């Protein structure tokens, strides 16, 4: 009966460990920083286009 809590704790620990498959990356995976940089570039382009056509938004 004393082994039951130990067994339950081990099961919980095993379930919380990330699997090996979750950490493997495919060829087309990009780091998160590049997505952030792309979003910033898109925002800057939209702002520059807006300011080019409409002076009020600058």
From Swiss-Prot:
Post-translational modification: 5 disulfide bonds are present in each homodimer: two intrachain disulfide bonds per subunit, and one interchain disulfide bond linking the two subunits.
Subcellular location: Secreted
Single GO term (MF): toxin activity
A GO term from the CC aspect: extracellular region
Tissues expressing this chain: Expressed by the venom duct.
Signal peptide per UniProt: 1-22
Oligomeric form and interacting partners: Homodimer; disulfide-linked.
Domain notes: The cysteine framework is V (CC-CC).
Family statement drawn from the similarity comment of this UniProt entry: Belongs to the conotoxin T superfamily.
Protein's name according to its UniProt entry: Conotoxin TxXIIIA
Source organism: Conus textile (Cloth-of-gold cone)
């Amino acid at each position: 009966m004393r082994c039951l809590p130990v067994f339950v704790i081990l099961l919980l620990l095993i379930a919380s460990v990330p699997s090996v498959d979750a950490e493997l990356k495919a060829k087309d995976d990009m780091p998160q920083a590049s997505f952030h940089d792309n979003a910033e570039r898109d925002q800057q382009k939209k702002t520059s286009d807006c300011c080019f056509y409409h002076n009020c938004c600058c």
